[in-house]
Amino acid sequence: MSAARRKEKRMSVLNGLEPKSVFKFFEDISAIPRGSGNTKAVSDYLAEFARVRGLEHYQDELNNIIIIAPATEGYENAEPVIIQGHMDMVCEKAPDCAKDMEKEGLDLAVEGDVVFARGTTLGADDGIAVAMALAVLDSKELPHPRVEAVITVDEEVGMDGAMGIDLSPLKGKMLINIDSEDEGIFTVSCAGGAHVECTLPAAREDFDGQALDIAVTGLLGGHSGAEIDKGRANANMLMGRLLYALGKATEFRLVSVRGGLKDNAIPTASYAAVIVSDADAAKAVCAEMEAQFKDEYRVNDGAICVSVSAGERAPALDKAATEKAVCMLVCMPNGIQAMSADIAGLVQTSLNLGILTTREDAVCASFSVRSSVASQKRMLIDRLECLTAQLGGTVSISGDYPGWAYRQDSPLRDLMAEVFTEQYSHAPTIAAIHAGLECGLFLGKKPELDCVSLGPDIDEIHTFREKLHIASTQRTWALLTETLKRMK
């Protein structure tokens, strides 16, 4: 089958759906492989879209693109508006799917009220934002102020595009981000964050005693932003408590301690290799601590298990290094540190000890620090630096990105809420998330921005079961276009 015939076949899948232009552009970009890190082709498609229409545009070396449409008649003096989303998608597929997502487009399908891709992720996160932005830019009938479409790359793997983009071509101070997956919810704040690694130097020595392996397992874990408020245990922190109790019962040396794979995930298990003077006392401590943990977390994390078994002898951390490692685990803050004063139930500030490792000469603890208030994030980083310095260690900070603080005064939020209420006969839900969004990075570059994030209903993003709801897309498009119309 020729490439032209394949494209024709793809185009026929969504051809009857409304809004026609939105689904046309969604189908166009769905024919282009656009996983994170593989965005050159789709970026070039967007640049060609702009070139053919004579639209001002900027494409950078990262493949980010800005496309600008001038104001329509009567809107020349209106404030410009930014429409923003990301072009990359998460590429996941069913176990029996043979598609090469690096080279092949998606096989779209419609069933009832949903669009999906056969065997793979759909990429409505965030292809629907790209499609809506293009539909606005392409329209000859839609009234609007100057529209500045900002379409970034690699949001799904660290927001690298938003970090690197130059926003100097933009005149707009209002930004509509179309990267939310729940219709009727306006996100108006998000957390900033940083990765903080605390490293304690460690000398080793021979220590007489019995080698034991201790494991804390069975925890639920979860995302350290979205699920930090669920009252679940952190396996690394529990291991710190256990080791401190062990030191009260018998002399011991730590050989290694490890737990967790990602600093933005609450660790479900933690493991320590130790050499103890009194094995029976150590086993009694493990049994006692298991009972304590089960009781404390019986509602939110009730399957915690502490096991102990014979280990292999190896050179251990010396007494000072063992004590400092345990002290770090006991004294470092973890979990929720502050709740929002503006939005009920929202976590404002938190941190998570997500990765714990031991090298030959060091013990390392990696934290994910989050806050929607920049000074609170800095305060937590300062605490980690101070505690680590007192223990003779060093701290490295990476991936520092700004948050998006809630604005009491938001003309964009007020306008969109007014339009929403008229269309839906009820007010939107005003929400915030304790995780990062590109809006936070843009605010770091342009603090004057007034942002709202919204989107149509998308189910099971980042899985091959992802589905975009058609009717929800229609309503979201109507909300967007009416908002633009009222910006005169």
Task: Explain the meaning of each model-derived region.
Residues 7-9, 13-114:
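Acidic/His- and Gly-rich active-site-bordering loop/insert found
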Residues 144-235, 247:
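Fold-level recognition of mixed alpha/beta catalytic cores in primary-metabolism enzymes, strongest
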Residues 75-157, 162-173, 195, 208-211, ...:
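Active-site metal-coordination/substrate-binding segment of hydrolases
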Residues 234-237, 241-257, 406-449:
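Active-site-adjacent substrate-binding region
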Residues 168, 232-249, 278-279, 324-330, ...:
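His/Asp/Glu-rich mid-to-C-terminal helical/loop segments that flank catalytic regions of hydrolases
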